[in-house]
């Protein structure tokens, strides 16, 4: 290899290249779950069944809807936006990092097969080309009270639901729902949704994207709950109404504050060293 070619290879930003590869693969994997958004209304005759523990797929419509919303919309689209502008959306990589940690704590003890997904997410985080930004939680703007208030309200409403599902999973209540670890899966996805909402309220770089995705996810789950009020794990009609209204309010508040911030200078990010 000539000296010029060697110099060119050395000048490549290998960390950025690896990040693009890992993040692209994982984003594609997460986005393939978007088909699950059709679960509340889809015919089970053509709907894909990829878990042999689900003896009656019709029972799992709500779990599938929540899986598609949080994994496909919230996580998948967040990672896609991060691929587009990794330096300008540091809050999104922090969300991915915390989601990977949360999955390891919440779900891995029940579902060891999830280790592969957690490792892939960890590789995305480790390859992030601006590592100092990962541990920088400072912000140039104060926490957005409206988003924080909506996040707290959602957490208070979902906490009894989360505690109940954890109890059911540990005690193997609910037949194939427990056998397929669907209760703890719903806990994981509910927790990640709340995480996205709380992080969006910090107004760190990327908060507009995370706030919008969190609002869309919450609104969709409200519609899904209204369509599946009596299904196992569903938030029911009342919960669906609250989720739909809350999601719309979250998106509206995000959009309103984003308009106010559009002319404000962005905080310079730490160097990648």
Regions found by a protein language model. Give the residues of each.
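Membrane-interface capping segments at transmembrane-helix boundaries
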Residues: 2-6, 10-11, 132-136, 252-269
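Alpha-helical transmembrane segments of multi-pass integral membrane proteins
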Residues: 21-32, 97-106, 116-128, 143-168, ...
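C-terminal transmembrane-bundle signature of multipass membrane proteins
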Residues: 188-272
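N-terminal signal-anchor module of multipass membrane proteins
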Residues: 1-49
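Hydrophobic alpha-helical transmembrane segments
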Residues: 12-16, 61-71, 98, 182-195
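Cytoplasm-facing juxtamembrane segments at the starts of transmembrane helices
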Residues: 11-26, 89-93, 131-160, 203-217
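Membrane interfacial helix motifs at helix-loop boundaries and amphipathic/re-entrant anchors
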Residues: 32-68, 103-116, 161-187, 223-243
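Hydrophobic cores of alpha-helical transmembrane segments in multi-pass inner/ER membrane proteins
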Residues: 66-80, 115-132, 188-198, 241-256
């Amino acid at each position: 290899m000539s000296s010029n070619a060697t110099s060119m290879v050395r000048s490549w930003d290998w960390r950025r290249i690896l990040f693009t590869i890992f993040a692209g693969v994982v984003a594609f994997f997460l986005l393939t779950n978007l088909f699950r958004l059709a679960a509340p209304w889809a015919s089970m005759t053509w709907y894909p069944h990829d878990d042999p523990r689900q003896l009656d797929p019709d029972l799992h419509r709500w779990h599938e809807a929540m899986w598609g919303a949080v994994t496909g919309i919230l996580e998948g689209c967040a990672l896609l936006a991060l691929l587009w502008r990794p330096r300008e959306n540091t809050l999104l990589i922090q969300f991915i990092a915390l989601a990977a940690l949360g999955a390891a704590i919440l779900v891995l003890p029940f579902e060891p097969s999830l280790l592969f997904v957690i490792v892939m997410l960890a590789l995305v985080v480790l390859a992030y080309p601006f590592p100092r930004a990962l541990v920088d939680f400072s912000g140039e703007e104060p926490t957005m009270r409206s988003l924080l208030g909506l996040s707290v309200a959602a957490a208070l409403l979902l906490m009894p639901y989360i505690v109940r599902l954890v109890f059911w999973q540990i005690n193997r209540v609910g037949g194939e729902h427990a056998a397929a670890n669907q209760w703890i899966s719903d806990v994981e996805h509910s927790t990640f949704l709340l995480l996205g909402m709380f992080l969006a309220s910090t107004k760190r770089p990327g908060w507009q994207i995370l706030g919008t995705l969190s609002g869309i996810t919450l609104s969709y789950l409200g519609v899904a709950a209204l369509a599946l009020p009596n299904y196992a794990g569903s938030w029911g009609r009342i919960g669906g109404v609250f989720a739909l209204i809350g999601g719309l309010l979250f998106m509206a508040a995000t959009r309103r504050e984003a308009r106010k911030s559009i002319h404000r200078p962005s905080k310079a990010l730490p160097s990648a060293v």
